[in-house]
């Protein structure tokens, strides 16, 4: 299984407008910078402003708007702000990158922690663990719904005779393709994003929108900082145990998805050894044929689910 050649023509991105949730840090911010260098006008929709300054000379390409992805009203307002910022009055790319860190603990762990079952005392409602589902899945559903709604607005000077090359990009995780017995809500949310992608991709072309999904392996970002620090406190180097992929590789995969007009309906696994098409289709066992060698390499490297 050979990795994909992610070479693509970045000139096709010049002058386009993108809406990126979770664009203030991590993968979202790194992607925003890469696309801005290619001439894309970026709206960063996040609950916080960018964590570091944008590139000198490219400030005019960036627009920040507060956005809580779990709130429909907040997302609607953010999309409207992005459309007002876009020089063409339209959006070309929507990237659902907002996410929360893995909430530790299997559902069984959480149930046992609630104590002995009783009819006298109600069990506590899960809070922090459910946040994974609220942000990662519900947030992605809202973003993709509104993205497909607002991507239909034509830009000024758009030739209706030319084919549209707009793009909706989901971000799941390799956790959407494997068992995760040490956590429940994070993989559940990512499996949900994968399901949303698979149920959506066959229909988006009728709106002139391509639809793709990223399924990255672990990479060093603010989201995994709590886990990284907890493992370090136990004397475990997370980077060595997991063999991080690079955030640059994830950015390259995202760029390949939006800049390549022939790429549609593909789920890309970003691994330390390269980026692979998971072939998440019926003909290829819904990704299983590709996933087996991918996970075997991770086990050979010392990863234990």
Swiss-Prot record:
One of the record's GO cellular component terms: mitochondrion
Gene Ontology MF terms in the entry: 2,4-dienoyl-CoA reductase (NADPH) activity
Keywords (A to Z) from UniProt: NADP, Oxidoreductase
Induction: The genes forming the sterigmatocystin biosynthesis cluster are co-regulated and induced on oatmeal porridge or the fungal isolates were grown either on oatmeal porridge or in YEC medium (0.2% yeast extract, 5.0% corn steep liquor).
Active site: 186 (proton acceptor), 190 (lowers pka of active site tyr)
Domain of life: Eukaryota
Pathway of action: Mycotoxin biosynthesis; sterigmatocystin biosynthesis
EC assignment: 1.1.1.352
InterPro entries the UniProt entry points to: NAD(P)-bd_dom_sf, Sc_DH/Rdtase_CS, SDR_fam
Sequence positions that bind NADP(+): 25, 27, 48, 68, 186, 190, 221
SUPFAM superfamilies: NAD(P)-binding Rossmann-fold domains (SSF51735)
Pfam families given in the database record: adh_short
Catalytic function, reaction form: (1'S,5'S)-5'-hydroxyaverantin + NAD(+) = (S)-5'-oxoaverantin + NADH + H(+); (1'S,5'R)-5'-hydroxyaverantin + NAD(+) = (S)-5'-oxoaverantin + NADH + 2 H(+)
BP-aspect Gene Ontology terms: fatty acid beta-oxidation; sterigmatocystin biosynthetic process
Family that this chain belongs to: Belongs to the short-chain dehydrogenases/reductases (SDR) family.
Reported function: 5'-hydroxyaverantin dehydrogenase; part of the gene cluster that mediates the biosynthesis of sterigmatocystin (ST), a polyketide-derived furanocoumarin which is part of the most toxic and carcinogenic compounds among the known mycotoxins. The first step in the biosynthesis of sterigmatocystin is the production of hexanoate by the fatty acid synthase (FAS) units stcJ and stcK. The polyketide backbone is assembled by the non-reducing polyketide synthase stcA by condensation of the starter hexanoyl-CoA and 7 malonyl-CoA extender units followed by cyclization and release of norsolorinic acid.
Official protein name in the record: 5'-hydroxyaverantin dehydrogenase stcG
Species lineage: Eukaryota, Fungi, Dikarya, Ascomycota, Pezizomycotina
Gene name in the database record: swtcG
């Amino acid at each position: 299984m050979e990795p994909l050649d992610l070479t693509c023509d970045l000139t096709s991105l010049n002058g386009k407008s993108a809406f990126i949730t979770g664009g203030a840090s991590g993968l979202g911010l790194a992607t925003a910078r890469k696309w801005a260098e290619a001439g894309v006008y970026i709206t960063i929709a996040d609950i916080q402003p960018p964590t570091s300054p944008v590139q000198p000379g490219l400030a005019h390409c960036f627009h920040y708007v507060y956005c809580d992805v779990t709130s429909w009203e907040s997302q609607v307002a953010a999309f409207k702000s992005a459309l007002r910022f876009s020089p063409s009055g339209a959006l070309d790319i929507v990237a659902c990158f907002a996410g929360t860190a893995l909430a530790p603990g299997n559902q069984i762990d959480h149930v046992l922690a609630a104590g002995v079952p009783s009819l006298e005392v109600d069990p506590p409602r899960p809070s922090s663990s459910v946040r994974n589902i609220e942000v990662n899945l519900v947030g992605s559903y809202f973003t993709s719904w509104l993205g497909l709604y607002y991507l239909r607005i034509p830009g000024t000077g758009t030739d209706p005779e030319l084919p549209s090359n707009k793009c909706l990009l989901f971000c799941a995780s390799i956790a959407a393709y494997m068992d995760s017995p040490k956590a429940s809500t994070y993989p559940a949310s990512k499996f949900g994003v994968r399901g949303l992608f698979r149920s959506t991709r066959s229909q988006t072309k009728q709106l002139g929108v391509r639809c793709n999904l990223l399924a990255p392996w672990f990479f060093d970002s603010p989201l995994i900082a709590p886990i990284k620090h907890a493992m370090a406190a136990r004397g475990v180097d997370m980077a060595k145990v997991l063999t991080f992929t690079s955030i640059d590789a994830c950015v390259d995969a995202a760029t390949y998805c939006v800049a390549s007009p022939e790429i549609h309906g593909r789920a890309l696994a970003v691994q330390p050894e390269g980026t692979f098409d998971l072939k998440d289709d019926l003909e290829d066992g819904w990704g299983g044929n590709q996933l087996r060698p991918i996970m075997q390499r991770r086990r050979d490297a010392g990863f234990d689910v």
